[in-house]
Amino acid sequence: MEFSHPDTELAGQPIGYWSWAACKAVVGHTRATLARHGISQPQWWVLSQLTASEEGRTRKELTAVLGGYLDVGSQLESEMDTVVARGWAAQDDAERLRATAEGVAFQDELAVLQRSLRARIHDGIADEEYVRALKVLQRMIHNVGGTAWHH
């Protein structure tokens, strides 16, 4: 890969631009790939949470975990509705959502897809480099008084 600038110039490049460009490219690629398989990224997050919990999750619990992901917030409720409408989850009388057998099978397929997405995104990047990049980003978030957390 050819980089955009020599290292001496990269050191002066704006993090706001490069973090935005990385987000746009990676999230755009991920969402386009998931869409080709008939699911949105927020629906995939919901389904992943449901398949990871035999007890299921309430909408409130799902919102507490997923609400801050890429500012999905207000659309999360409709994404949960879609997961139920598509038959990937069912809501019981106690208002707990649980993955259906169809949802579990679909999630298993998507897990393979997600691993291939991750492999492509991380191609040529050692785990040590990735960890360092995340720590740098977390430090920058901290430096400006921001907060971020991913389960």
Regions found by a protein language model. Name each.
Residues D81-K135:
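Charged, amphipathic alpha-helical coiled-coil/dimerization segments
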Residues A22, V26, L110-G124, M140-A148:
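Alpha-helical linker/hinge and terminal dimerization helices associated
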Residues M1-H37, Q41:
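N-terminal leader segment of winged-helix/HTH proteins
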Residues M1-D7, R57, V131, K135-H151:
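C-terminal regulatory/oligomerization modules of transcriptional regulators
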Residues G28-Q75, M80:
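N-terminal helix-turn-helix DNA-binding core of bacterial DNA-binding proteins
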